[in-house]
A protein has these predicted regions:
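Charged low-complexity stretches with an acidic bias
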Residues: 22, 58-59
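Short, charge-rich amphipathic interface segments used for partner binding and complex assembly
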Residues: 29-58
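N-terminal acidic leader/helix
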Residues: 1-23
Length: 59
């Protein structure tokens, strides 16, 4: 089960992105998370996805 808290979720996903070397799209897909909804949630909470570094960051 994924963390519901946005900060914990970002930490979890960044760890998976780094350790498992996968794309955000694939990681969200295997965890049954809608990409567009997730990107909106990131934005609402002051985060963005840095494609060059494959990492979720604070705005």
């Amino acid at each position: 089960m994924l963390p519901n808290d946005i900060n914990m979720l970002v930490s979890f996903l960044n760890t998976k992105l780094r350790d498992d070397d996968m794309s955000l799209e694939h990681l969200l897909e295997i965890n049954d998370i809608n990409l567009n909804e997730f990107m909106t949630r990131l934005d609402r909470n002051g985060y963005f996805f840095d494609e060059n570094n494959n990492q979720i960051k604070v705005k």
